[in-house]
């Protein structure tokens, strides 16, 4: 049935619900999970050009890859604890494009994503990622009602 399930997450509470449900499904059918998140760093040049002072609690936005990778690894530990094989992908760029690219590259049979997503930086417009993914996916899409 399903061998490879791509799961998009931004680390939010709603995305975590989708990850949990995808993990249960993967365990039930013996599939592996490809866990995907995307980030878009703010360039130092742009910060200097616009004289932007970044508060300490938002420094992750300048080079968020490490934080995204840490969030993915934390989620992956929970998936592995459930007995499911998982690989993580922290990709720079648009979240929907990252999910679609991984699904295509890995030959995935299913994409699981929450119906709403939001981060502290509000880089996910509510509903825009699942909408784009559902319209352009190379495989079936399961949209989890998370709110």
What are these regions (language model features)?
Residues 1, 14, 51, 74-111:
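Structural beta-alpha unit
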Residues 54-70:
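A short acidic, glycine-rich active-site loop
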Residues 37, 115-116, 146:
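Short secondary-structure boundary segments
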Residues 110-135:
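Glycine-rich, Arg-bearing micro-motifs that act as flexible, cationic patches
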Residues 123, 138, 146:
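Short, conserved catalytic or interaction motifs in soluble domains
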Residues 34, 87, 142:
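Conserved beta-strand positions in the Rossmann-like core of class I SAM-dependent methyltransferases
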Residues 3-56, 82-84:
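Small/aliphatic-rich secondary-structure junction motif
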């Amino acid at each position: 049935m399903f061998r490879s399930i791509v799961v998009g997450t931004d680390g939010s509470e709603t995305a975590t619900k989708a990850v949990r449900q995808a993990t249960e499904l993967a365990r039930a059918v013996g599939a592996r999970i490809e866990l995907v998140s995307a980030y878009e760093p703010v360039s130092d040049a742009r910060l200097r050009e616009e004289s932007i002072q970044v508060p300490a609690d938002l420094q992750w936005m300048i080079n968020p890859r490490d934080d995204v990778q840490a969030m993915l690894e934390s989620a992956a530990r929970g998936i592995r604890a459930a007995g499911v094989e998982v690989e993580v992908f922290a990709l720079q760029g648009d979240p929907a494009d990252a999910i679609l690219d991984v699904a295509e590259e890995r030959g995935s049979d299913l994409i699981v994503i929450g119906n709403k997503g939001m981060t502290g930086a509000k880089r996910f417009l509510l509903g825009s990622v699942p909408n784009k993914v559902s319209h352009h996916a190379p495989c079936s899409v399961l949209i989890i009602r998370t709110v």
